Amino acid sequence: MSEPVEFLDLDDLVDMARILLGDPPPIRDIGLLGSAAARPQTTVGGRDAYPTMWSKAAALLQSVVDNHALVDGNKRLGWLATAVFLEINDASVAGATDDEVFDLVWAIASARSTIEEIAHHLEMMSGRRS
């Protein structure tokens, strides 16, 4: 049996935004930020919509980047939240290069990446293979 996944919540994202972007954080829509925090936990018919840790991380990253809950800093917060989510679940993308991060986050912001593609990139950045 695998370890339970530890999720970030809305308060975690607000705290990260405050640290990253200043106090008060530039929140445009708190509901959209809450939605982004909740998305990795989504279930459909009693099953996880995002069954792997990587797909959960991908859902978080895509939602924070694309929901535009902040006036500014959505991409930066998305990456930070994803890196923290993975760290608290015993994975790491700390070895990812700035170019890898930039390319992935911009592909998401440009609506060019699926959850599966994002999850794959995150897993490759971690050095893990499933």
Residue ranges and their predicted role:
Residues 1-130:
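FIC/Doc superfamily catalytic core
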